[in-house]
UniProtKB/Swiss-Prot annotation:
Family: Belongs to the metallo-beta-lactamase superfamily. Glyoxalase II family.
GO biological process per UniProt: methylglyoxal catabolic process to D-lactate via S-lactoyl-glutathione
Pathway info: Secondary metabolite metabolism; methylglyoxal degradation; (R)-lactate from methylglyoxal: step 2/2
Protein name: Hydroxyacylglutathione hydrolase
EC identifiers of the protein: 3.1.2.6
Keywords: Hydrolase, Metal-binding, Zinc
Encoding gene per record: gloB
Length: 259
């Protein structure tokens, strides 16, 4: 049985902490800061950090990797096509990696960065996805390195995962993403309800994650490029008709960048 908790870092990052409660072994995903993990380990000295999973090379995801590796000897698993500090296992599309007895499938999801990967497993009772900065709750990452032609299919691929899949993304951006989703689909009742729910959570300083793939299909405009109203809003933003899913996505992303 794997338990997953969030260790907050910086202003809005989450370092995901996976725990095998029977064996008292743990793993972390995207430790941009070693501090929160060190403090958790100090408070739980009987636990061993066995693995560090990395989705991409940005410093707010890898800044704590080398220190944690030096302190614990944990295995560092990260994308093969990016510079990851202390990486022991280079991962690419189709690879599998066993962590705490759970086998994760590696999915290449370029766009935010060119070598970005996600980790998916359907072994637990509830499938789980660590999506890094590719898929956010009600949103997606900026394209710092990739293109719409890369990122839209990557997101569509994640959207095709089982609807009950729990989505663990790396930032608490949900409320701002939902404000944009409301602008794109002002009559979508699922967006409105989610906005109200998340507003209550954040008012109490509570985490809005994990999401689910099913909820993202209903409320995330970047996964809804085939919806008539979403396309109409994208067309209005660009001032012309967007004839492909990629074009609609690109219009939405450029709109969100200035929203």
């Amino acid at each position: 049985m794997i338990q997953i908790d969030a260790l907050p870092a910086f202003s809005d990052n989450y370092i995901w902490l996976l725990q095998d409660t029977a064996k008292r072994r743990c793993a972390v995903v995207d430790p941009g800061d070693a501090g929160p993990v060190e403090r958790w380990l100090a408070a739980n000295p009987e636990w061993v950090l066995s693995d560090i999973l990395v989705t991409h090379h940005h410093n707010d995801h890898v800044g704590g990797v080398e220190r944690l590796r030096q302190l614990t000897g944990a295995r560092v698993c990260g994308p093969a096509n990016e510079r990851i500090p202390g990486r022991d296992l280079a991962l690419d599309e189709g690879d599998r990696v066993d962590v705490l007895g759970v086998t994760f499938q590696v999915l290449a999801v370029p766009g935010h960065t060119l070598g970005h990967i996600a980790f998916f497993s359907d072994q637990p009772a509830t499938p789980i996805l660590f999506s890094g900065d590719t898929l956010f709750a009600a949103g997606c990452g900026r394209m710092f390195e990739g293109t719409p032609e890369q990122m839209q299919p990557a997101l569509a691929r994640l959207a095709a995962l089982p609807e009950q899949t729990a989505v663990y993304c790396a930032h608490e951006y949900t409320l701002s993403n939902l404000r944009f989703a409301k602008a794109v689909e002002p009559t979508n009742p699922h967006v409105q309800q989610r906005f109200e729910d998340v507003s209550r959570l954040r008012a109490e300083n509570r985490i809005s994650l994990p999401s689910t793939i099913g909820l993202e299909r209903l409320t995330n405009p970047f996964l809804r490029t085939s919806e008539t109203l979403v396309k109409q809003k994208a067309d209005e933003w660009k001032g012309h008709s967007n004839t492909t899913h990629v074009a609609v996505f690109a219009a939405l992303r450029s709109w969100k960048d200035t929203f």
